[in-house]
Amino acid sequence: MRIPVLHDFFIKEQLKSCVSGAVLFDEPLDRYTSMGVGGPADALVVPQSMEELVQLVRFLRKENIPFLTLGNGTNLIVRDGGCRGVVVALRGLQKLSWASDPEGKIRVQAEAGVPLASIVQLCIKESLAGLEFCTGIPGSVGGAVRMNAGAFGREMKDVVTAITVLNEHLELETLSRRELSFEYRRLNLSDEAVIVCAEFALCPGERESISAEISEILALRKSKHPLNFRNAGSIFKNPRNLPAGQLIEETGLKGTRRGDAMISEKHGNFIVNLGHARAADVVDLIEEIKGRVENCRAIQLEAEVHIVGEDG
């Protein structure tokens, strides 16, 4: 049931006045997540600039309306009951620019909603080296930085030089790399802070070499990951020196189904949507994996995906 304040005509009109992008009520979230599951948001709002985002969040805080920010919807499971309050979709924050610095590096600035795929394409076009490891990672800049996304021995912390956040005081604040504390698949940042922009330091490179590495990574991902089905990416973080996918494969759970959700037969650390999966099915499989791995190997797997919302 929608929170009462979002039934108010005045509040609805105020929401619409905050942004030039879409304002949708009772909007199903399955179409906004890579897993393709999830119930409705009370409201989904799409700011088109940092200024609109600031205005929107200030209004939500003033009215005590809970909100959740949403990037590309990867690494996210929305429960079947959906999300109360407002989902703020950052896909409208799409500015991308770059320039040389005095040290000869290229500083790329990307707003939170820019897909990593767009930056990878920029790297090919402009012969920029350093972000090849992002090839095939389906997220956007904001989420990738917050979770310190990485692959092939590289992580966001290796290339991020600064981020701009909307902080808990509702002010835009720029934090330098030395002010940021990264861990494995995590940036230590207040839950109330919203990443709105990030800066990366890249190096001039050879286009042929960069393109070849990107093609190699794409081929490797296609060979190992179930890219022909909707999925949320890696379900669990890798324990130290032990791939989660290997642990799951050892339990014999690959191919296990709950409804239309299935533990991938191709890679044990992926759960795929065969067509009409429910979030409850996905969560059941996550709990089944955690229990089986703990029983078989005495290892507690930690989820990499975030589970939000209410049960249906």
From Swiss-Prot:
Q: Which reaction does it catalyse?
A: UDP-N-acetyl-alpha-D-muramate + NADP(+) = UDP-N-acetyl-3-O-(1-carboxyvinyl)-alpha-D-glucosamine + NADPH + H(+)
Function as written in the Swiss-Prot or TrEMBL entry: Cell wall formation.
Entry keyword set: Cell cycle, Cell division, Cell shape, Cell wall biogenesis/degradation, Cytoplasm, FAD, Flavoprotein, NADP, Oxidoreductase, Peptidoglycan synthesis
Give the FAD-binding PCMH-type domain ranges: 37-205
Query: GO terms for CC?
Result: cytosol
**Protein's name in the database:** UDP-N-acetylenolpyruvoylglucosamine reductase
Q: Which InterPro entries match?
A: FAD-bd_PCMH, FAD-bd_PCMH-like_sf, FAD-bd_PCMH_sub1, FAD-bd_PCMH_sub2, MurB, MurB_C, MurB_C_sf, Oxid_FAD_bind_N
Where is the protein found, in the record's own terms? Answer: Cytoplasm
Cofactor(s) it depends on: FAD
Gene that produces this protein: murB
Q: One Pfam family of this protein, by short name? A: MurB_C
Q: What is its EC number?
A: 1.3.1.98
Q: In which pathway does it act?
A: Cell wall biogenesis; peptidoglycan biosynthesis
Q: Does the keyword Cell wall biogenesis/degradation apply?
A: yes
Sorted alphabetically, the Gene Ontology BP terms of this entry are: cell division; cell wall organization; peptidoglycan biosynthetic process; regulation of cell shape
